[in-house]
Design a protein with these regions (language model features):
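Structured mid-domain segments that build the active-site/substrate or prosthetic-cofactor binding neighborhood
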Residues: 1, 139-145, 152-313
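The substrate-binding groove and active-site-proximal loops of carbohydrate-active enzymes
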Residues: 1, 30-48, 70-90, 172-186, ...
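Gly/Pro-rich turn-and-neighbor structural signature
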Residues: 2-8, 40-159, 292-316, 328-331
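Active-site-adjacent "subsite" loops/lids of carbohydrate-active enzymes
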Residues: 15-52, 159-167, 185
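C-terminal non-catalytic alpha-helical accessory regions
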Residues: 238-396
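Beta-sheet-dominated interaction scaffolds and their linkers
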Residues: 393-454
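Short, solvent-exposed loop/turn segments enriched in Ser/Thr/Gly
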Residues: 441-449, 481-483, 492-497
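Surface-exposed binding patches on compact interaction domains or structured appendages
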Residues: 454-486
Length: 497
């Protein structure tokens, strides 16, 4: 039924890189006992029969047939050496082409076929494995959106041509990338242009996962594939504005295109499924604070624009802009806040508890936003579309449930107790000697000193400097939780040398 419907609508059908001869892997797993082991060296007859069924079932439809063979599922073939596997693969392809010729009643060279040069298969190609010239070579990215090679010059005249298999969604190693869009338009344009300019332009296959979270990259790739020369490297912002205008009208197109560009960029820094508390530094270059501010600013702007949306656009805005922005911001800040919580707890800061509460608050917000998307938005039209687990990954495979990083609670001391910490150092005074990073007059940066409370109540502090060229942002104050003082150098007061 699917094949007939696709053919009626002019859709060319095919199967994945590990599903040869128009047979989905599920076709095999349902009949594993009947077909026998997925091993061509020991079960040629059973597997050939399986392949014949696929060829016969699809012969009346317009298709492109994946040839070759990998392991049982999306895994490498067998346990032999590359040379042994290449010898088996050669027999597999010879047998597959004989089957295609018999079933279709014509020269196999007249039947569209591809060989996916994917993961371990690229090693075989690089070692000299060849397929007939009429077979398309489907080169692949690295599972994370970077093509592994441009079109080899010696392949650019091959009869079968060259194609690309590209991921904007990944379920597998090295890490999942499923929940939300993490791909920027400039990156997509760069990668597909590399393919296009080097002759990888006969077929582009894109792994889009569950479709809904990846609507933006899907739209761009389809437009770019239609006419690659129409979108130049310096025109990706124009594309985003046109996309925003098409979906939300002219009034807010500029603002929305900026929101979408930035959340995609920030997610590309660190995809949600690969977040941890160790990515950005709490003490160096104010990384955690800077990234937190970027995400919070973005989320605030998305809220502000959302309030201006006409009612007719509200649902679409939530799906395409507000949820991706705020949910991504929430996941990022959960790990950023947890990183601060852990360091501050080791230092005994009472503010460690504030960051523990922040982690819990953000998790609640994430749960509420996701429930709204799944249950309320558009009358529940997209139920379970945003049910992917996206918090608590420790390896590539999806956890059983969302979970936040473990946080630590601090029991304040019974009386106000001062602690001091400086930028670039995780230790604190009076437990260790503190030293600010080196100042220079090129960047002319300022560095901070944190004065914080480890107990209950308040205390007063004063700051003294030994040199007149030292600038401090605060000379005295009262601390209940913490206070940050910025230290800089007035280079005009320093003598040369």
């Amino acid at each position: 039924a699917n094949g007939q419907l696709a053919d009626d609508m002019g859709i060319v059908m095919g199967t994945s890189h590990h599903e040869p001869m128009m047979r989905p892997h599920k076709d095999y797993t349902k009949r594993r006992k009947e077909v026998g082991p997925w091993n061509y060296a020991t079960n040629k007859e059973g597997i050939d029969s399986f392949f014949i069924e696929g060829a016969e079932r699809s012969r009346k439809y317009e298709s492109i047939v994946t040839i070759g063979m990998r392991g049982d599922g999306d895994v490498a073939m067998g346990g032999g050496t590359d040379e042994e596997n290449m010898a088996v693969l050669s027999d597999v392809i010879k047998g597959q082409r004989e089957i295609l010729g018999r079933v279709h009643g014509k020269d196999p060279a007249e039947i569209p076929q591809l060989w996916a040069v994917f993961t371990e298969v690229q090693r075989y190609y690089d070692k000299g494995f060849k397929v007939p010239d009429d077979v398309m070579l489907l080169f692949c990215d690295n599972n994370w959106g970077y093509i592994r090679r441009v079109g080899p010059w010696q392949e650019q005249r091959r009869k079968g041509g060259m194609g690309l298999y590209y991921h904007v969604d990944m379920n597998g190693g090295p890490w999942n990338d499923r929940w939300i869009n993490t791909t920027t338009i400039p990156k997509l344009r760069e990668q597909f242009n590399l393919a296009y300019q080097s002759g990888i332009d006969d077929l582009w296959v894109v792994n889009v996962g569950d479709l809904k979270p990846k609507e933006l990259p899907i739209d761009f790739i389809m437009r770019y594939a239609w006419n690659p020369d129409a979108i130049q490297a310096d025109e990706t912002d124009d594309y985003l504005r046109q996309w925003a205008q098409q979906n939300f009208g002219e009034a807010h197109a500029e603002a929305i295109s900026g929101l979408v560009a930035r959340y995609s960029k920030y997610n590309l820094w660190r995809k949600p499924e690969v977040q941890s508390t160790n990515i950005f530094s709490v003490v160096n270059h104010c990384e955690v604070d800077r990234v937190t501010d970027l995400w919070r600013t973005l989320a605030h702007e998305a809220d502000s624009v959302g309030q201006l949306m006409p009612q007719a656009y509200k649902d679409a805005y939530y799906q395409l802009v507000l949820y991706p922005v705020k949910a991504s911001a929430g996941v990022a800040e959960i790990y950023l806040a947890a990183a601060k919580n852990r360091l501050y707890a080791r230092q005994g800061r009472v503010t460690a508890n504030d960051y523990a509460r922040r982690v819990e608050e953000l998790y609640t917000v994430d749960t509420v936003m996701t429930a709204y998307y799944n249950k309320v938005l558009a009358g529940g039209k997209w139920e379970k579309m945003m049910s992917d687990i996206h918090l608590g990954y420790t390896k590539w495979s999806m956890p059983k449930r969302d979970s936040v990083p473990q946080v630590v609670r601090v029991e304040p001391l019974s009386k106000p107790t001062m602690g001091v910490a400086v930028e670039g150092c995780e230790t604190l005074s009076p437990e260790g000697e503190l030293e600010l990073p080196v100042f220079d007059n090129f960047e002319n940066r300022k560095y901070y000193i944190d004065i914080f409370n480890r107990g209950t109540g308040t205390f007063d502090f004063k700051v003294k400097t030994d040199e007149p060229w030292m600038d401090v942002s605060l000379r005295k104050g009262k601390v209940e939780t913490e206070s940050r003082i910025w230290v800089g150098i007035d280079w005009t007061k320093l003598k040369a040398g």
